[in-house]
Amino acid sequence: MDEAAPRAGCTVWFTGPSGAGKTTLARLVAASLAARNRPSEVLDGDEVRATLSKGLGFSRADRDENVRRIGWVCALLTRHGVYTCAAVISPYDEVREEIRRGIGRFLLVHCTAPLAVLEARDPKGLYRRARAGELRNFTGIDAPYERPPAPDVEI
């Protein structure tokens, strides 16, 4: 039996505040890969929170656990030859680097925009709700976002 050599997968991790374009870019990259017959998946932070991480809150420990869960799925998919595009706020550099080390084949894409632009976009009304005090621990308003010191790409 003649077996083809397995393809190497990779994780492209899109990090940045809400509204910075992470999911849009992840979907575009995955579609481009699929058009080239490369197996690809998108893991969107909002979708994962509603399923795999249902029940987690927004404390530091819960945010870290959410990111680790997504990282574990990315590592599994990458190991099986899938190009995985993860769109996750992932506000803490320590956990992002932990995920990078665990996956190996990993690119970090930092998506950024000025806060005024993010607040003007606000497709889910989250910045407005955070400013009104209706949302607590909102990244970029009353919870920190640690800018990656050395992303592979910054957009």
List the model feature ranges, each with a label.
Residues 51-53, 59-109, 127-130, 134-140:
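Glycine-rich phosphate-binding loop used to anchor ATP phosphates in small-molecule kinases
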Residues 1-12, 36-39:
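Extreme N-terminal, non-catalytic leader segments
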Residues 25:
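Hydrophobic positions on the alpha1 helix immediately C-terminal to the Walker A/P-loop
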Residues 34-51:
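Short beta-strand-centered segment that lines the nucleotide-binding/catalytic pocket of NTP-utilizing
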Residues 28:
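Active-site signature of alpha/beta-hydrolase-fold catalytic machinery across serine-
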Residues 112-115, 120-155:
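Small-molecule kinase domains that catalyze NTP-dependent phosphoryl transfer to phosphate-bearing small molecules
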Residues 22:
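Conserved lysine of the Walker
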Residues 19:
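Walker A (P-loop) phosphate-binding loop of P-loop NTPases
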